[in-house]
Amino acid sequence: MLEAPGPSDGCELSNPSASRVSCAGQMLEVQPGLYFGGAAAVAEPDHLREAGITAVLTVDSEEPSFKAGPGVEDLWRLFVPALDKPETDLLSHLDRCVAFIGQARAEGRAVLVHCHAGVSRSVAIITAFLMKTDQLPFEKAYEKLQILKPEAKMNEGFEWQLKLYQAMGYEVDTSSAIYKQYRLQKVTEKYPELQNLPQELFAVDPTTVSQGLKDEVLYKCRKCRRSLFRSSSILDHREGSGPIAFAHKRMTPSSMLTTGRQAQCTSYFIEPVQWMESALLGVMDGQLLCPKCSAKLGSFNWYGEQCSCGRWITPAFQIHKNRVDEMKILPVLGSQTGKI
């Protein structure tokens, strides 16, 4: 294990085969050229120069102000504003952070990833990088850092987000049902304080686009035939098993993952579509009506609703299957589409 030098000591390793520690004793080397630590690691330019650091990724509430010194002007820097709280959205930044580290290492730069204390936010980012580059499950990557630094302990929210990252194949796929459900849950945590709902939360109204993806299914109001949503908006879930299926508000990665629609589910749970926006603002729950004929299609509840299979979905935008018809969209003559 590494020993941080005392006030009058030089750089020493208690084990010559162990990873190096900087002379400042404020950063640990995870692998050649990759360090993590706290705010003290960037307090003095000399600390960075001694360790050969030429790229710094900061994950903190404030961006550090680097003192002038040799090499500071040439530093690669990336700042990700983030509090060390379970509700902080770190997942949406992971691809950018992992790419920054990867590019810096590819160009021969040594990288420091730091937060304030060097135990949670920076640990989460380094864990994501190890997961991606070494194709490691969350637990194995996290364990590597805890061996290096036993006090390393990311909050439970970051743990959950990294498990979602793993479930998405080590990349943030914004089109996946997992990410869409995650994004909805993050909005729910702030609702109803939000004055406006983020526009990226809503799927495009299918009446505003003429074509869909290959093999997509279009769902129409059974009464008036108005197009309502596409199959890509359906958020699949695993079958529930009684009260335990909705004992926890937050869905786990395993409950978000499924290989197909559940036949026993009598409703589709979908992401919000643009035509729903006026009905959702300022209220916690209500009915979902067809925007054309006002036929009742289903309901929504930001606190969640139980599916007929037993799974609790939060938040819930539920369309009853017996209120809509499926229309398969198939490509015809290249750019045209046909419906069957």
From Swiss-Prot:
InterPro entries: Dual-sp_phosphatase_cat-dom, DUSP12, Prot-tyrosine_phosphatase-like, Tyr_Pase_dom, TYR_PHOSPHATASE_DUAL_dom, Znf_C2H2_type. The modification N-acetylmethionine is found at residue 1. One of its GO terms (biological process) is dephosphorylation. Keywords: Acetylation, Cytoplasm, Hydrolase, Metal-binding, Nucleus, Phosphoprotein, Protein phosphatase, Zinc. The active site is at residue 115. The keyword Hydrolase applies. Its cofactor is Zn(2+). Substrate binds at residues 116-121. This is Dual specificity protein phosphatase 12. It comes from Homo sapiens (Human).
